[in-house]
A protein has these predicted regions:
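Intracellular alpha-helical coupling/juxtamembrane segments of multi-pass membrane proteins
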Residues: 250-305
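ABC ATP-binding cassette signature C-motif
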Residues: 1-260, 309, 318-518
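Post-kinase regulatory C-tail/linker adjacent to protein kinase catalytic domains
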Residues: 313-315
Length: 518
């Protein structure tokens, strides 16, 4: 049974086409992984099929009575609302139904006998619907999902305005899962989840009986939950049966076959053109030349396989730092209240340390405290001598109004435009990306612009806060290689063991030092 039909969909931004003439059907129960390099249009596609964005051409048609759940990273959580109230919002339609039923019961007190029977029947239908949807078990459902995604440790009476970005994402995801729609649309749901919560989500999606479309660059996670791959590539959307690994096998063969066909056709074209050039003027062979020219004119050209530009992240290194990188004495981190026990930490030159732990326990706060960007609650943190810092924040702090060229030029004013373009291209950005405003780029493309600044500023210490968020597979692979070859010191917050295994020399588990219940 088809629950969504997409026909002849085309869309772009200005003269930059995102996809062209895309058509497909979504069937009930399909578990789809939507993949593609940064900037291929995955999030744009999600916005179109949910009606948040109108396509330039084509139609999106949903079957009647299909409920769609989309995890919108930009959804508003109102100040003054508790986590429990936000999660209970998943059942707003049921609460409305209960209100309607109660109003009917109130009206029965003054209703005439004829009207009474009609109202009783209507209230009975509403009661049955509430029972069928487990309305009277809502609190149990909320608690179950809250435990699974680590929200209980925050306290369900906590105001949502006090949550970190990662905690907020968990609330939005929990609310979406509680609503149990006919189709789930998930855009990088693991970005702000901890290892144990990713594992719970994996099990949940594995057994999910309805359909979902999942965008994720976490390949082990993707492989474990999907049975179909939709690949956004070169303005097209292609369907592959199986998981990501199976897709890669088939796609590689497909690319090789297309390359071979392209070369054969180019050789044939060269041969035909040569024959026409040599024989079109001779009376005896003119007809044969015209015949071959007609064949050339009618030939359907095979395009050469295209691949997303491969990034190159080579960090510029400054002179060697002193032996000590950081040293803390009874450091307590936090804002209004302490987030940690007194910490006595030590980091020395050439160490590559990863900080892990649950969302909201202070990983970013620790980084900023060590760098002196925010004051400590108590204690002190000292940075060593001759430190040249490269700092990658989790999210961009700019307004995004500048073009990528101007964004880089702002930091590297001595560069020529050619040098700016070359630096951005080496980070995997195309000419269209480079000339666009930063705000219209995907999350992965924006991260590459910030990485462009980072790698070109000489450093001997890199402090990285979730650098893999939003990056596609090729970019993550290249970033890991570059960090492995980096001769300076690294302090990094990361939630992906697959990324930091073979890179980290030491792991600091902040959950062992936090004052929060986890």
């Amino acid at each position: 049974m088809s629950i969504m039909t997409v026909k002849n969909l085309s869309h772009g931004f200005g003269d930059r086409a995102i996809f062209n003439d895309v058509s497909f059907r979504l069937l009930k129960g399909e578990h789809i992984g939507l993949i593609g390099a940064n900037g291929e249009g995955k999030s744009t596609f999600m916005n179109i099929i949910t009606g948040k964005l109108m396509p330039d051409e084509g139609t999106v048609q949903w079957s009647k009575n299909v409920s769609v759940g989309y995890m919108d990273q930009h959804a508003v959580l109102k100040k003054g609302m508790t986590i429990r109230e936000a999660l209970a919002g998943a059942f707003d339609s049921l609460f409305d139904m209960e209100k309607q039923m109660n109003e009917l019961y109130e009206q029965m007190g003054s209703a005439d006998p004829d009207k009474m029977d009609e109202m009783m029947e209507e209230a009975s239908v509403l009661q049955e619907l509430l029972m069928a949807h487990d309305f009277y078990s809502i609190d149990v459902k909320v608690d179950e999902v809250a435990w699974a995604l680590g929200l209980m440790e925050l306290g369900l009476d906590t105001d949502v305005s006090a949550l970190s970005g990662g905690q907020r994402t968990k609330v939005l995801l929990a609310k979406l899962l509680l609503s149990k729609p006919d189709i789930l649309l998930l855009d990088e749901p693991t970005n702000h989840l901890d290892r144990e919560h990713i594992e719970w989500l994996r099990r949940y999606l594995e057994s999910y009986e309805n359909a979902f479309i999942l965008i994720s660059h976490d390949i082990p996670f993707l492989n474990s939950v999907v049975n179909l791959i939709y690949h956004m590539h070169n303005k097209n959307l292609d369907r592959y049966v199986g998981d990501y690994d199976k897709f890669m096998e088939v796609f590689k063969v497909k690319q090789e076959q297309q390359e071979a066909a392209y070369k054969r056709q180019q050789a044939e074209i060269a041969e035909l053109k040569d024959f026409v050039a040599r024989n079109k003027s001779r009376v005896a062979t003119r007809n044969m030349a015209m015949s071959r020219q007609k064949k050339l004119d009618n030939m359907e050209l095979i395009s050469r396989p295209t691949e997303a530009p491969e990034p190159e992240f080579d960090f510029k290194e400054s002179k060697i730092s002193g032996k000590v990188i950081f040293e803390t004495k009874d450091l307590v981190i936090g804002y209004d209240e302490p987030l940690s026990k007194p910490l006595n930490l030590y980091m020395e030159r050439k160490q590559k340390i990863v900080i892990e732990g649950a969302n909201g326990i202070g990983k970013t706060t620790l980084l900023k405290s060590l760098l002196g960007l925010i004051p400590a609650v108590s204690g002190e943190a000292k940075m060593g001598d001759s430190i040249e810092l490269g700092y990658f924040e989790q999210e961009s702090s700019g307004d995004g109004e500048k073009t990528c060229i101007d964004e880089i030029w702002q930091d590297f004013q001595a560069w020529t435009q050619f040098e700016v373009r070359l630096a951005l291209a080496k980070c995997g950005l195309t000419t269209k990306h480079i000339e666009s405003k930063v705000k219209v780029l995907s999350g992965g493309e924006q991260a590459k612009v910030r990485l462009c600044k980072l790698i070109n500023r000489p450093s001997n210490l890199l402090v990285l806060d979730e650098p893999t968020n939003h990056l596609d597979v090729a970019a993550k692979t290249e970033l890991k290689r570059a960090l492995q070859e980096y001769n300076g010191s690294i302090l990094m917050v990361c939630h992906e063991p697959e990324f930091y295994e073979g890179l980290a020399t030491e792991i600091w588990d902040l959950s062992e030092w936090t004052t929060r219940l986890i």
